[in-house]
Amino acid sequence: MGAGLVASLLAGTATGLGALPVLVTSELSRKAQGPDVGLQRGRDAGGQSFSLVIPAMELVRGQGHDGPSAALRVAAGVLLGGLFLRVWHDLMPHEHALKGHEGHGGTKWNSALLFVLAMTLHNFPEGLAVGVSFAAPQPELGLSVALGIGAQNIPEGLVVALALRASGASASRAAFLALLTGMVEPVGALFGVLALSLSSALLPWGLAFAGGAMLYVISHEMIPESHRGGFEREATTGLMWGFVLALVLDMSLG
């Protein structure tokens, strides 16, 4: 339990580390932001596949299920994770650079606060993934997930801080709020750890749930954001490299 929480805290802190350059610059071209966000999403997509869904399938088989029975259990976990994020997305007020205000209420809230709330939608499932993966029998699984998420949190922190600067926040406030978005990850990890404390048999469900939640965020939020400004090719190149990074981490540590 402790290892997962500490790892998620360190991974979340990487967001603040990535935000530090905002103290000396307030601009990053959209062309550069495309591959940056694409890299993050590629790593998420790879991590969702290699470190969450595939281990969930192996664990379900280890519990004596096979064929359609195993597939249905993992599929149900993935769909439940996506549904959880969809409901949260529809209820919580937040704001995106591309799509503007979304969620229920909060239309008069400060735009910086709404943007921070939007990032909690991204970071909660990442923390959940770290917490759940550290409960797996293979200790290297949790390390792979935490390192991958921590690595992609660094450029994400810069993108978040620059967006906050563009909305009018001071450099120090932008860096602090970017760090704050990363602190949602230990909350997600705690959520996963507490759920799994009920029964170890829930582990494959937890891995699949975290994978589904991340998949929802990748498709619904981050890929559209990375394609804004007409730099789809650069964003897709970044996504491919991020996916390869996740593959290398998983195979090197596994």
Swiss-Prot record:
InterPro entries for this protein: ZIP (IPR003689)
Keyword Cell membrane recorded: yes
Pfam families named among the record's database cross-references: Zip (PF02535)
Residues noted as binding Zn(2+) 2 in the record, renumbered to the chain: 123, 126, 153, 156, 185
Assembly, per entry: Homodimer.
Annotated transmembrane regions: 4-24, 74-94, 112-132, 143-163, 176-196, 198-218, 234-254
The protein, known as: Zinc transporter GufA
Family membership: Belongs to the ZIP transporter (TC 2.A.5) family.
Source organism per UniProt: Myxococcus xanthus
Function: Mediates the uptake of Zn(2+).
